[in-house]
Amino acid sequence: MEPLVQQTERFSELLAVSCGSLVSTWDAEKVRRALQWARYLLHVYRRFAGRGRVREALERRLPARGGPLGLRSFAALESGDARLALRLLRNRALAPAAARALPSLLFPGPAADHRDDVPQSRLVLLARRGSALRLLCRLGGDAPRSALLRTHAELLDARLHELGGADSAAARKLLDTLWTRGPREHVLDVTAEALLLREEDPEPAQATDPAGADETQKLLRWLLESPEVLAAFCRHLPAKRLASVAGCHHALSRAYLDLLTTWATRLHYDLQKGAWVPTQMEDMPWEELCLRLQSLCHAQPFLQEEVLVTLRSRKALDGDFEVPGMSIWTDLLVVLECGIVLE
């Protein structure tokens, strides 16, 4: 175990160095050995990805070596060769001889042995993500919002994958940091997009990817275990958008419906206005409450059933009144069952 840990630590240091000026002393042979080392660790990742003890031992040691430019997790070994290659390609300090040899080392052609070990697809994916992010950043406010959200969601998903492991502590720390430091509305929008990534993916293999399901579960767990974030998520997202997300994740739909019923109890009936009104500024207005419940009903048949069962149960507990204004549950059911459009 210890030799493997040392190998990984040393490669993490090399990965950090590949961004700096020290590569000016590298020749073609050194670049070749560095790439071989990265591919060896790719085999290590594939062999031990499902072994919890090995992952935990490596996860504990990696952040301390190589700094932020090195390996951040055991899962990062899966793309270590591509990251190394991309950094060398971008580093103008790389010695000329090594720079000339690098393309042939990365793309040896169809006659090369072990073609599945060549980082072509992983390199292309990283390069595309990096280029897309840089382009969107340069466009600034002119960037299409859907493209920006999609790119940020894919980057978040990739980062959660890199954190790896069954322990979600590292994922939660990352998400908490984003929530604390980032623009909160944007974090909520990116979270929603990330939860829809595989549901909207046209490729069946992507939509059923078990590894991707791990990232989704980490994101869902963070959302459901953070009351402040969950409440903000369920208030900020447009009704139709949130209903689409809830329709893909039953635990979220249940939590969302619980919040809506809680917010409903805070409204009171104003006899003079003949309407349900908030008691405090932060309460959800009647019109928005109805719109969100309608959107849930229209999203999926099972959601409509859950909403109606919940409201009927609440109505029965509240006295089963049929007179308008006596019970908010009665009036909500009238809106939903009669199909009154509030959009």
Curated annotation (Swiss-Prot):
Main subcellular location: nucleus
Pfam families xref list: FANCF
Statement: the UniProt record of this protein carries the keyword DNA damage: yes
InterPro entries in the record: FANCF, FANCF_C_sf
GO cellular component: Fanconi anaemia nuclear complex
Keyword hit for Transmembrane: no
Localization terms from the record: Nucleus
Phenotype of gene-disrupted mutants: Viable with no gross developmental abnormalities or significant growth retardation. Gonad defects are present in both male and female mice. Testes are devoid of germ cells. Ovaries show premature depletion of primordial follicles with almost complete loss by 14 weeks of age, and aberrant estrous cycle. Significantly increased incidence of tumors, particularly ovarian tumors.
Domain of life: Eukaryota
Keywords: DNA damage, DNA repair, Nucleus
Gene3D superfamilies noted in UniProt: 1.25.40.490
GO biological process per UniProt: DNA damage response; interstrand cross-link repair; ovarian follicle development; protein ubiquitination; spermatogenesis
Summary of the function given for this chain in its UniProt record: DNA repair protein that may operate in a postreplication repair or a cell cycle checkpoint function. May be implicated in interstrand DNA cross-link repair and in the maintenance of normal chromosome stability.
Oligomeric form and interacting partners: Belongs to the multisubunit FA complex composed of FANCA, FANCB, FANCC, FANCE, FANCF, FANCG, FANCL/PHF9 and FANCM. In complex with FANCA, FANCG and FANCL, but not with FANCC, nor FANCE, interacts with HES1; this interaction may be essential for the stability and nuclear localization of FA core complex proteins.
Protein known as: Fanconi anemia group F protein
Native source organism of the sequence: Mus musculus (Mouse)
